[in-house]
Curated annotation (Swiss-Prot):
The keyword Oxidoreductase applies. This is Catalase isozyme 3. Its main location: mitochondrion. Occurs in almost all aerobically respiring organisms and serves to protect cells from the toxic effects of hydrogen peroxide. Its levels are highest in the light period and are lowest in the dark period, hence it may be important for scavenging hydrogen peroxide at night, rather than during the day.
Amino acid sequence: MTMDPTKFRPSSSHDTTVTTTNAGAPVWNDNEALTVGPRGPILLEDYHLIEKVAHFARERIPERVVHARGASAKGFFECTHDVTSLTCADFLRAPGVRTPVIVRFSTVIHERGSPETIRDPRGFAVKFYTREGNWDLLGNNFPVFFIRDGIKFPDVIHAFKPNPRSHVQEYWRVFDFLSHLPESLHTFFFLFDDVGVPSDYRHMEGFGVNTYTFVSAAGKAQYVKFHWKPTCGVRCILTDEEAALVGGRNHSHATQDLYDSIAAGSFPEWTLYVQVMDPDTEEQYDFDPLDDTKTWPEDLLPLRPVGRLVLDRNVDNFFNENEQLAFGPGLVVPGIYYSDDKMLQCRVFAYADTQRYRLGPNYLMLPVNAPRCAHHNNHYDGAMNFMHRDEEVDYYPSRHAPLRQAAPPTPLPPRPVAGRREKATIRKPNDFKQPGERYRSWDADRQDRFVRRFADSLGHPKVSQELRSIWIDLLAKCDASLGMKIATRLNMKANM
């Protein structure tokens, strides 16, 4: 077998016609263990047996603490509109520029192998392999999230995860925790809405959720929100009965639909839009633009088309390109930066940290995560470091090595920051207006479906009357008629 002497990366393209050990020695019998006589005890010297069983016992890696259930596909992103006035990002430099991507869709709460018909947010993560490094855009199929401060992220996930005693998901825990956080209301108006269970991944919207920053070549910084719209339209499963039927027939229906569609040449496609806000104008709005529980009104901040995403190739190996695929919002490129969005700031650390736990400190060396452009730093050694290096200098600065600091394509605009060190909530929480507006935008049938789903969940026998009353009051603050409808369905009285 011919091996690459510099990269040391084994590949199935180098497969031999006979079985070997991991070290390359031929295996003459892969059917029987080495024993003393045909019935005798197994000998410890059967190295191949020990290696085979030991490797099998270690095939699984820790699953993601969230978004464990998912499916990936590969393709390209093509810039279709001139956005150079907004950002100096190289892959958006001109219409027609194509960038390779890999995309992972997922559910959030439950384990690998769980049904893909659960009422649960869906992840929509895109890795762009640009000429200036990888950019990861992580989002969901809802434009908002349950909380606005990352310090509560472990708590909200614990509340949605199965009960630690029974390992059964129970919504009384969700309602108990989030009754203390009315900011969560807006996301419930998506979760219990018709979009709560997408029919599959191809007919699903995506949203960046958090607020990012575009930086232009002139040094102008503007807030930006990202939106993915499927060109084939949005489809959802409207009833829990249909979801149970689809999920009962095939727990992997969305994964199979994605794979089969691409294999048949019916390539899923999305259009990327952005909303852009000048930070100098943020005070004119009745919400905080850095609050991820809020949407930006499209009549005031219209969607602007940027490009199209096409998935035209299935993964070659599910483990290598799905389980080992690692995303993190900390991966940005020149022209795209973070904002002071509290959830985003926390995610920048948390995602990289969870990948180091799942995959090891050198997870960005894995082929699916590695950049496609030349790169160089002094991050040496560590577990499973398989990068060939022959430099003598592993520090900076040095007169004996060519490594230099990169000159920024455009400096980040200076932004004075002043204030006291404090733990505090934002000034404009405004938690009830947008949920109420969303509810009133629906037709009567859609409102009724929302009421039924929400009330049925509140009707769980372990949800106390006190807790139901709290939620009825919260919903009534969004819309008085909604509070009345929920109360009526639960045979309770709304406190208006």
